[in-house]
Amino acid sequence: MSDNVSQMHTPQGKKLLRRILLFSLILLLVLGGCALYFFRDSINTDAMRRYFKYLNVTETASTGHFSFDAHSGNRYAGLGDGLALASVSGVTVLDANGAEQASLQIQMSLPELRVGKDAALCFDAGGTSLCTVSRRKGTILQATSERAILDADISPDDCVCYSTSESGYRSVLYVYNAAGTKTYRWLSSSRYLPVCTVSTGAKYLAAAALGQQEGMFQSSVVLFDTTQDEPLRELPLGDELIFDLEFLSDDTLLAIGETTASWLKLDGTVLGRYSYADAYLKDFDDGGSGFLTLCLNMYKAGSRYSVVTLGADGTERGSLFIGEEILDFSAAGKYIAVLTASDLRIYDETLTLYASTDNVAAATDVIQRADGSAILISGGSGSLFIP
């Protein structure tokens, strides 16, 4: 009888044990979720993602190692998990393992490189060649201008614009959609429009205009709706030489000038301005998530460099003096990589040190990635630094 009683109660005991284990598991998940929420600022989720993403990356592994022909005129940019390269002989896109995804051979004297979501834009500054190559679709666009290409840009969704001139016109602006189809052209016989940018979906085109007012140099941004024949409006910028324009969103524009950076709404509202004061602008990068990074120097030559990060209202988020020459710097996500002859340092957007390494060999370029890792370029190779 006792054996029968024991056998009858065993299944219920197992059910109770399963319930206890299930309850404990749910409790652990809830407590873990609460911990992640309340301590989300101190837990580095990027580090966790990097751990699993690069778990098998070693010095002998192919992942994170790139090889190419070295040249002083090469230009580099991150594209997806891989690398885009523009050289005097063309453009190449490599995947995360260093394998070629796409390439196009074109001769260039001064190659320039921009990247969008899936495509790399390459053009010969002062030359006549321009192309876009997609890591998924290969060559999308190949164009040859009548005269020198002054500037070109690619949007986050791979739309393209460029500025040139043609017989009878001081400036001609072209816009292409992400499929490489020409969707807009603007011709001006009276104005110089040497700098341009295009918004997502190729909806808006913006160009910096050079002019005079009462004998004084003046610049402005001419805004175009690509569905209309006439310019939408003009945004004055005063006596500022504009180096670059970028759409930060469909209704916000960033203008990088010789002495000032300006954030503008498309209706003309000034969101913020930042003056470099007595410093000289050496370089800039708007690849950070919601912030602009400037590299400034107190002198035209010398090593009194500083790095400044700015929010979209022009206020400083961080400022840091670097007591040696900055060879290169790059921003992506919430990180900034600063390369000097002695080391590589990665900072967050407040310029708090996040990671560093002195194993930079003869590195000349750095590409920051949004997950906190960085690609160091040295000669004809690139290697991944994982904090």
Task: Please provide the spans of the model-predicted regions.
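N-terminal Lys/Arg-rich, disordered targeting/topogenic segments
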Residues: 1-19
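Non-cytosolic head/periplasmic domains of membrane-anchored proteins
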Residues: 101-208, 215
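Acidic, serine/threonine- and glycine-rich low-complexity intrinsically disordered segments
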Residues: 187, 191-308
